[in-house]
Amino acid sequence: MTDGDGELVYEYFLAHVTHEGLDGAPEIMRRDGAVSDVECERGKKLRREFFARFKTRDLLYFADVDNTVTRRGILSDEKKRFFNGWALSDRVVLSTGKIYKSIEKTARELGVDKNPCCCLNGAVLYDGRGGREIVAKLGEKARPAARILREKGLPYVLYYPDALRVETPLGQKDYENLLRYDEMYLDEKGETDFKRVVKLLAFVDEGDSESEAIVDGAAAAIGLKALRTAPHSYEIVPPLADKGRALKITAKRLGVHFRMTAAVGDSMNDLPMLAVCGLPYAVSDASCELARFGFAVAGSDRNTDLPELFDKVSRGVL
């Protein structure tokens, strides 16, 4: 990717990405008063330039369904419209969601379940031609971290791709928290599908700084980070780089279908993942949310260029 290409992708990222013919982000932002008429026209020009540089056939478009699949497995109309604006063969579902069955339902709803390759999440690749492949394989990798937690007397459970393993005594509160946690992840029958989650879940109350430090250290020991997911628990999960790796594997598996010139996502949290991959990128819903990352937004003098972004990602700032 040349500097010019990078600048083009970055600028296009600021303008949002959308397929020609749809109600694109520049128009939406103008309608909402976020950009001026001049800025809107510039955004549309950048969109045309982007697709002139990175032809549609060279793009890997993916839908991140993390915050779209509800407990009832309902896909938002907005994402349906956006996703359906692309050729069927150019669609891949990429998600770190935990409910595989619900995500599979979404894949069917989007018509990609029979595609050559569909990434259900950062840990599992689903190939319509041959079933699943576990990519992250966190189970064994989590062993050193689990040992640290056990030696320090912290309760945890370890999710393998095929089982939930309770390896430390759980108090009544921990057990209740586990049940409450698992209620979030229901399959199509309304049953908790906790056997298909690839992560280490540690039970630590928010504000218990000593225990929090232990969990952080345990995660760091295996090169991962601990994520606070609830007031009572931490997750140690594969990092965004693993999700990006799954995206690369997906593109490679697709072979002649994609040359991975660029990737187009639909969520702000796709940004660091794509940056980790070292790919030209664009996302669909960037707007004032960019201010959180120090990016330029309409009417703002703040700016962050691509090299600084990649530096932030490499240092784990994003």
Locate each region found by the language model.
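Short, structured coil segments at secondary-structure junctions
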Residues: L110-D113, N121, I222, V276-C277, ...
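Short, well-ordered alpha-helix to beta-strand connector turns
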Residues: R57-D58, S89-D90, K114, V197-V198, ...
